[in-house]
Structure formats: C-alpha cells, structure tokens
C-alpha cells in the first residue's frame, strides 16, 4: 500500500503507525487529485495497480433524478474520479449490502455504468461477501465490485476459504475459521495498564 486517504485523523494516525512507508492523507478525498497522490507517494509515472475503497452512500434515486448526482453521494463520485485520474489498472469498491436491495439497486447500476463509460469492465454479477468465510472472526457482509481496464484480465471474486467459527455443520469441506477468542484471547488485559488512562503508550 503506497497511499491511503482517511478523513478521521485518529484512524489516519493508526494507519500511518501500522504502515510507516505509506503516504497517508488525513483529509477528505474531495479536492484531492490523482496528481497530488502520485507526487506525495513518490509514484511518478509508474502504473497504479489497484485503487481500493468504500464510500458512504446516503442519498438514493428520486423520480427523475440520478442517485449518482445526489450531493449526499459525492464520495462515490470522488472514488470513480480518483480511479480514473490515477489511471489504475484495477479497482475494488466495497459498500454495504443494502446497496443491492430494492430502490438502492438502481444506484449500484449507476456506479457500474459510470465505470464502464470510463473504460472499465466490472466483474458481474457483483458479489456480497462475508468476512467470516475468509478467516476473519467477524460476521460482516459487504458488497464488492471488482473492475479492470479494458484489455486487462478481469479477476474473479474470491471463493470462501473457511466457514464461520461455531458453525454447527461442515460446509463446503472447508476448515473452521478463527473465533474472537482465537484472534485476541492472548492479548493482555487493558485494565492491567493504568497508564493507558492518560497516555497512548504503555
């Protein structure tokens, strides 16, 4: 990961701590250009392999309106813009499962259309993936779109690698994924570190 954009300063600082070589932009993507990202990340004219992100979607289509034009959905437009300004070979767009349901589905179709008009193919049908089927101890469903520039091979969506911890029956002949206890059970009790009340380090 060579660059990341995160509007929340605390989350941006955590990302920078975990990925010190990554150029982190603690600001909104609005007004940030692909050129600025390339400059700060030291990319020059090198190919950007993939842009991955998820943007809040709050406004949905009304009669006679395109949802993608709704100001409340501006961050989705910004994601599309950044992908094209960086001329990324691939993109991964993540969002809530609700975008696939009812009236919201029209907005999803508009997003796909916007990418296709800009020269990207989107792997269809889109997929809703659950993190618990990919070795993550969390029951979290999210919509994913994978896209590639025309002329490049279009990746498939990943197949499950585990089944959720605690599942009563064996599915797909896959191993059980980790539980929350497996993932964090060996961490020390925070209450043993009184200094954390006043500082971020112990």
Question: Residue locations for each model-derived region?
Answer:
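SAM cofactor-binding core of SAM-dependent methyltransferases
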Residues: 1-31
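Conserved acidic residues
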Residues: 2, 49, 89
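Active-site flanking residues adjacent to catalytic metal/cofactor-binding acidic residues
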Residues: 5, 27, 53, 93-94
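Short, glycine/acidic-enriched loop or turn micro-motifs at the edges of active sites
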Residues: 9, 31, 57, 97-98
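Class I S-adenosyl-L-methionine
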Residues: 35-45, 55, 62-202
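A short SAM/SAH-binding and catalytic strip from SAM-dependent methyltransferases
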Residues: 49-52, 57
């Amino acid at each position: 990961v060579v660059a990341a954009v995160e509007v929340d300063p605390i989350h941006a600082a955590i990302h920078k701590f975990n990925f010190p070589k990554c150029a982190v932009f603690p600001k909104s993507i609005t007004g940030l250009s692909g050129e600025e990202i390339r400059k700060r990340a030291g990319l020059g004219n090198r190919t950007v392999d993939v842009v991955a992100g998820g943007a809040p979607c709050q406004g949905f289509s009304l009669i006679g309106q395109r949802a993608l034009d709704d100001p409340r959905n501006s961050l989705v437009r910004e994601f599309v813009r950044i992908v094209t300004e960086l001329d990324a070979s691939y993109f991964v767009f993540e969002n809530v499962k609700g975008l696939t349901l009812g009236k919201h589905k029209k907005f999803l179709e508009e997003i796909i259309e916007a990418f296709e008009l800009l020269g990207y193919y989107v792997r269809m049908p889109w997929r809703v993936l659950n993190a618990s089927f990919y070795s993550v101890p969390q029951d979290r469903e999210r919509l994913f779109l994978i896209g590639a520039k025309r002329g490049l091979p279009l990746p498939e969506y990943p197949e499950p690698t585990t089944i959720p911890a605690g599942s009563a029956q064996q599915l797909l002949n896959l191993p059980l994924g980790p539980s929350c206890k497996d993932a964090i059970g060996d961490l020390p009790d925070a209450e043993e570190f009184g200094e954390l009340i006043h500082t971020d380090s112990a």
